[in-house]
Regions:
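Conserved alpha-helix/loop element of class I SAM-dependent methyltransferases that forms part
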Residues: 5-22
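Short glycine-centered segments of the SAM/dcSAM-binding site in methyltransferase folds
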Residues: 25, 124-125
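Class I SAM-dependent methyltransferase SAM/SAH-binding core
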Residues: 25-29, 33-83
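A short acidic, Gly/Pro-enriched loop at the edge of an enzyme's catalytic core
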Residues: 86-94
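A short beta-strand submotif of the Rossmann-like class I SAM-dependent methyltransferase core
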Residues: 96-100, 128
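A short glycine-rich, Lys/Arg-flanked "PGG" loop and its adjoining helix->strand segment in the class I
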Residues: 110-122
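C-terminal alpha-helical "lid/dimerization" subdomain adjacent to the S-adenosyl-L-methionine
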Residues: 129-186
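Core SAM-dependent methyltransferase catalytic element
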Residues: 184-207
Length: 207
């Protein structure tokens, strides 16, 4: 139950196309069924695509869907982006949709952002669409209250509780400010905010 998922997907892929109009290779981190890559291919055709996910059934589905839409090479890698071996300076675009909020402590975040930075070619971009927090506790409480009301509106009180309990147990999102600052720290030359609505945002950085 993501707020503004459609517009965030549109914005990060359109921004990627404009930042790297001659892109040849995309990496999709936590690709799921391949929706982000498919949207990217609708804007920049025939990219070579590397799809990473923990779930083999999802990877199989993504491979089938993406292969049908590009003449470029499609590579699938099952596993965690933190552990998978990929060649540095080899991607024009990295897409990370609803995945980085699984990172845990500061070291985990910094190590992962450093790795993603190194995987990009100079001038390439990392684009993120994800669950986020606020830096101010009072505002953070407010945004999660709003999100809870949104969830209840689409699925009732039990659905709201189920989603929020899952997030509490499984996820450790950070604020957009934290992630943009971290991008600068690990070497990104520019960072950009594309969209934000309560506890969801779309943003990125250019190497």
């Amino acid at each position: 139950a993501t707020i503004d998922a459609t517009i965030s997907l549109e914005l990060i892929t359109e921004a990627s196309k404009r930042i790297v109009p001659n892109a040849a290779a995309v990496l999709d981190v936590g690709c799921g069924a391949g929706n982000y890559t498919l949207k990217m291919l609708s804007k920049v055709p025939n990219l070579s695509c590397t799809l990473v996910d923990l779930s083999l059934p999802m990877l199989d589905k993504a491979f089938e869907r993406v292969s049908a839409e590009t003449n470029g090479k499609v590579v699938v890698k099952q596993g965690d982006i933190r552990e998978i071996d990929l060649e540095e300076n080899s991607f024009d675009i990295i897409l990370a949709g609803a995945v980085l909020h699984h990172l845990r402590d500061d070291q985990d975040w910094e190590t992962t952002f450093t790795k993603l930075f190194k995987l990009l070619k100079p001038g390439g971009c990392l684009m993120i669409s994800d669950l986020i927090t606020q830096d101010t506790d009072l505002l953070n409480e407010y945004t999660w209250q709003r999100y809870g009301e949104y969830l209840e509106g689409i699925g009732g009180a039990a659905y709201r509780q189920k989603v929020l309990d899952y997030i509490e147990k499984e996820d450790s999102p950070r604020s957009m400010n934290y992630q943009l600052d971290l991008m600068k720290k690990v070497g990104f030359s520019k960072v950009e905010i594309l969209h934000k609505n309560m506890c969801f945002g779309a943003f990125g950085g250019i190497k």
